């Protein structure tokens, strides 16, 4: 029996089961909970039966998946709970563990979060290095970058990374679909959100 050691939000049951059944199709896993479910310490997650050697061979890999993905889901759930009632959404990052992107992004959704981008192909993200290349453009580099992105990729959403309140304002005025507020203190974040919301 695989039990939760702490209170957590479950994620990764299917991939954990796959670790067992890839070692031996004779291993049978019975789910006792569902991904996305909040459980208390001691709650049974999976009941595993089959050849002992196969179970012990796959056990560590299966546990690693459950631990990692449930950790992501649980932390996401805490953030989601913190912003409950504010209208804010918790979005994940594209900066994931190599080879685990889809699984970690799935775990974010188990915790109540929203996937931001899967890769570089599904949204235009205008960052500081792009803006530096457009220094001197009129009316400002952000407006120029948003305009160029919309012309070249009309079907994609455009996001602008803003390090300052002025950049956040310019991004909103330029019609960016999203403004990513980077490295701002909580009081700056509040002001930027009010500024962007109009």
Regions found by a protein language model. Give the residues of each.
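Acidic/glycine-rich phosphate/pyrophosphate-binding loops and surrounding catalytic core
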Residues: 1-159, 163-174, 178, 190-195
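Short secondary-structure boundary segments
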Residues: 183
